[in-house]
Amino acid sequence: MPAHFQHPWRSDFPILNIEREGAPLIYLDNAATTQKPQVVIDAISHHYATNNANVHRGVYSLSQLSTEAFEQTREKVRCFINARSITEIVFTKGATESINLVASSFGEYMFHQGDEIILTIMEHHANIIPWQQIAEKKGCIIKVVPISENGTLDLDTYKSYFNSKTKFVSMVWVSNAIGVENPIKECIEIAHNNNVPILIDASQSIQHLHINVQDLDCDFLVFSGHKIYGPSGTGVLYGKERLLEVMPPYQTGGDMIKKVTFEKTTFADLPSKFEAGTPNIEGCIGLGASIDYINGIGIKDIVLHEQGLMKTAIEAIQSYDFLQILGYNGSNVSALSFTMKGVHPHDIASILDKKGICIRAGHHCAHPLMQFYKVSSTSRISFALYTTHDEIIQCIDELASIYALFS
Ligand code: PMP
């Protein structure tokens, strides 16, 4: 591998040693999913090779070992986001399921005809459709906070939306489509000044920013394991205990009950009440390994490294007038969206693929945001802790060649 592609953390990720199209893999689609370090891969195979049994059920020691390893991850997640208690950490299969859980359970319990829910125009579909579904069922209204051209949330409109009918806010912290960071603490304060609970979609923050849910004081926070160097099919819902306590179960079945008779079922305490059925045991154990891995490096160093990458990318993209960045306001975190004059994003991504460079082309599951920018798709580059400055420069140099080819 050429020296300029080397990075202290890179060698921890076996896939990054693989060549694609005769060149080292340049993976710049980290907002879609991150690559996995060897320690995560090892944790999963170690579990299968030595500890595998179902959790929370067996009195035999193998099941207890499996349960311990699984539950250790809950404590690791609690510590990582500084939740007050492990009762506030619910395992799900991803951010999507976490949001669906809150929308349908909290919505079922709290929403009534004419109530209002606040979202923003930059939400991922996973933070739109669950709210639409419950709004339709309960006769609620969704209000959408706009942004300015550079991606900045319109806080005046946000503030003006609150009234006695407002029941919930659900908002992304960092946009997956344009990388803009919302002033999340301020947004939480505004919601709370109006006595409205707020869910934070931290899918694109958990791997790039330091998160402290007690300091943020958010009511719910969600993320996916696969975006934080962990396995797919794992996710977390953080919720304040007093809210989770009063919410009805989302799914029902084994492992979430105290007692079942054909007349009546009583439900288990938190967090089991929201974890029906056999969970993704090995996935959660892998997630625990990914959190250990991040802690081993230190989120502060990751933040610094990725801020440097953003500076490199912005300067390089802005040096070409045929590239137009969508939604850049200086707050962007590890993702940038752009268009190229006269060239379709899918053509760009296909040509880069032939050079071993993976970037995302499409609507990024954010149709309303694409409609706002009057485009059907964009090209997006997104970074991770193993991304190097040279990879970004090489990718952007290739963009110049593609533009030359098409013009
Ligand atoms: N919200 C945001 C901001 C995301 O980026 C994503 C994934 N792209 C999701 C929600 C949904 O995550 P998942 O598909 O892992 O459930």
Locate predicted features:
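Pyridoxal 5′-phosphate
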Residues: M1-S407
